[in-house]
Amino acid sequence: MGVFSIANQHIRFAVKLACAIVLALFIGFHFQLETPRWAVLTAAIVAAGPAFAAGGEPYSGAIRYRGMLRIIGTFIGCIAALIIIISMIRAPLLMILVCCVWAGFCTWISSLVRIENSYAWGLSGYTALIIVITIQTEPLLTPQFALERCSEIVIGIGCAILADLLFSPRSIKQEVDRELDSLLVAQYQLMQLCIKHGDSEEVDNAWGDLVRRTAALEGMRSNLNMESSRWVRANRRLKALNTLSLTLITQSCETYLIQNTRPELITDTFRELFETPVETVQDVHRQLKRMRRVIVWTGERETPVTLYSWVGAATRYLLLKRGVISNTKISATEEEILQGEPVVKVESAERHHAMVNFWRTTLSCVLGTLFWLWTGWTSGNGAMVMIAVVTSLAMRLPNPRMVCIDFIYGTLAALPLGLLYFLVIIPNTQQSMLLLCLSLAVLGFFIGIEVQKRRLGSMGALASTINIIVLDNPMTFHFSQFLDSALGQIVGCMLAFIVILLVRDKSKDRTGRVLLNQFVSAAVSAMTTNAARRKENRLPALYQQLFLLMNKFPGDLPKFRLALTMIIAHQRLRDAPIPVNEDLSVFHRQLRRTADHVISAGNDDKRRRYFGQLLDELDIYQEKLRIWEAPPQVTEPVKRLTGMLHKYQNALTDS
């Protein structure tokens, strides 16, 4: 298949995008909106954005959710713009600079919140800047301008959602059902590898793959939740299944680690059971039945705790999986599982990275302002808007440099494409709404094909082309204005790219160290006698951090193993029967305070001092456990944790 060929699976979304653009264009001109371009641009971005991210037609609900975020971001941006203008209308330069800081602040927030919700904050940052720049000549029209922008954006979003519904969006439910079955088989095969205690690299690859697949399943759950309210019960079950999948990974890896020192704990009976190969979820079901019978026969005390916990988690997984597939009413047994433990959210480890993004966005916007004022260029405001858009959207993604390059390619491609529409197509079709709609439908269709292939520059070309062609009411054709707009877009992208190159993001190592210390803090915080604290479910948050660590440091197995060991320590200590008394409770609080000091330390010297203090306190704690006659289920995990912290002290304290 050629580079520019059209695959059958790409056609439906391309038609959907073309329909969204045509609907927005028709409604914009029919209701005599002053700037129908905003409605068309919004419809195109809202529809094409999820397709570019997914690399194909987005699942049902994705476009609707993105549209809602865009509405929220636009309203926040408009309110911020009104407040800034009312407060500083007598100082125009200060007003623009405050808007630059606001754009940076929104980028900072978007770097800390969930990636799905960050779009709203990024959008609110540059919306305020667009409004402030546009009303420079007529500041008294600010409320009217903000209202018009909100109205046209809502119309564009409505058109994108309507087009999505007209062309029967794909449901992700079948994918979820298939993945649940496949994931359970993979979990069983991981436990087989761990029982065999074979090659450590093979085990690392297996559990790493399962962590990624579990994270992907959680993303599917979010999509299913956005799709329809009828999946509420399935959504509740999938939340619990996420924890169960992570529990299965943890128990399997702990089984592998236990055999490093005490291989005799895994009896021949269980070794023989796990030698049976499995291919389907039915095979796993049969094996679990056999294991439950063996556990009843041998007794819980004779069964290794990791295997006992694994079989229990796998059984609960099977029960909830059947409920997800059938979407039936939640039974009493399921409700008991679902009401289990409150999930704890962890503090972001990317605060330094977020601050770098703040400075990148703020400085690039300020640089654009200075460039505009110094040159007096009529399209300097267009360049500033493009700077704000690029930096606000690029900063929240893993590779902002490539996002900038995508925008540069897109704006360069938009120049000849926009020229064709501006000089030839639109002047010859503006008298006929049908021809005008068809001409833009063709543009949307072919770019829609390329967007699904994630072609470099396709997303930027779509937005930039619509932005520079004349879609105003009434239409006016001034070539100098068109050329200024096109060049302003290119210059804005270039300036944003230069700032991103100059303001280096060196936060990667710091983020990695903070993540590892958060794992240590989680393991230490599990040493508690507080019943409410012991019920807290930190497993999803810990694996979310592990997933971030894997993305930041691909292939760094020592870091992954250390993090996984801390997660295992946390789970084991959380279930350990720690003696309940005031002496240990006071010391638990002291340990948690010291672990928090390690995370928040401002430099390496302080961090080393607090980490050394933590190690000393753990030694004292082990002595206290001996005095209070704690059982081996408590003393052994604490000893292993202390040994790991001594071994990796430098990795956890040095920048």
From Swiss-Prot:
Transmembrane segments: 13-33, 38-58, 69-89, 93-113, 121-141, 152-172, 370-390, 407-427, 431-451, 459-479, 482-502
Superkingdom in the source lineage: Bacteria
Cited InterPro entries: PHBA_efflux_AaeB/fusaric-R, PHBA_efflux_pump_AaeB
Membrane topology: Multi-pass membrane protein
Gene Ontology CC: one annotated term: plasma membrane
Chief site of localization: membrane
Location in the cell: Cell inner membrane
Stretches assigned to coiled coil: none
GO biological process: carboxylic acid transport
Keyword Cell inner membrane included in the entry's annotation: yes
Family, as annotated: Belongs to the aromatic acid exporter ArAE (TC 2.A.85) family.
Xref: HAMAP family: AaeB
Protein name in the entry: p-hydroxybenzoic acid efflux pump subunit AaeB
